[in-house]
Amino acid sequence: MEQFYYYWSMWFLWVLTTFIFEKTKRRIAVSVFILTNIILSIHDIALYFSLNAAYLMFFVCGCVYAGYLGMYRFRYIMVYLTLVAAYAFVYLFALYDPVWFIIKPEWAAVILIVLLTASVERNFEKQLVLFVLGMCQGELVYSFVIQKLAGAMAVGGFQWLNACSAGMILLFGISKYEHLASQIGQKSKRSNKGATKMS
């Protein structure tokens, strides 16, 4: 079942946003985005490439949200281009010499991009935008390069959707872990201050 990881990951994210997060307008927007993305995942749009509609939704919403967050500075553009190059490199290297890969190339690309994103950006929303845009544009670059060898191919199919949704959950987990670690660190500092005052 090719779309297994995508559907389970998106349903997991939908349950988180709908039942666990605080009731805000942003929560409603994210829930609607997830459900719409799941619905669109079975449709393809024929342009220069055959584009999956859910992939296109990720790309367009990522660009819009990047503009909303003001991510048009040189630093973000360089990080974004690095992520695109990393994604395309992993896939092209896997075609050239697949022996080096212990795991599937899509998972290697996701792990690499998640690590790069988490190491250069601390804000979770900006991490998410950088990750999604890097994955989207990287897939487009890879498809453009490989079409000369393999002919026309679908961009953003379920293989890509699986990897992208799993990467978003991984980023969410890293964000929550960092938040928890900072809270524990603050509590330990307070308890140490209290102990020194008592002594």
Curated annotation (Swiss-Prot):
Q: Which UniProt keywords apply?
A: Cell membrane, Membrane, Transmembrane, Transmembrane helix
Instruction: Write down the Pfam families for this protein, in alphabetical order.
Output: YphA (PF24124)
Q: How does it sit in the membrane?
A: Multi-pass membrane protein
Residues annotated as transmembrane: 1-21, 28-48, 51-71, 83-103, 127-147, 154-174
Q: What GO CC annotations are associated with the protein? A: plasma membrane
Which subcellular locations apply to this protein?
A: Cell membrane
InterPro entries per UniProt: YphA_Bacsu (IPR014617)
Q: What is this protein called?
A: Uncharacterized protein YphA
Say which species the protein is native to: Bacillus subtilis (strain 168)
Gene that encodes the chain: yphA
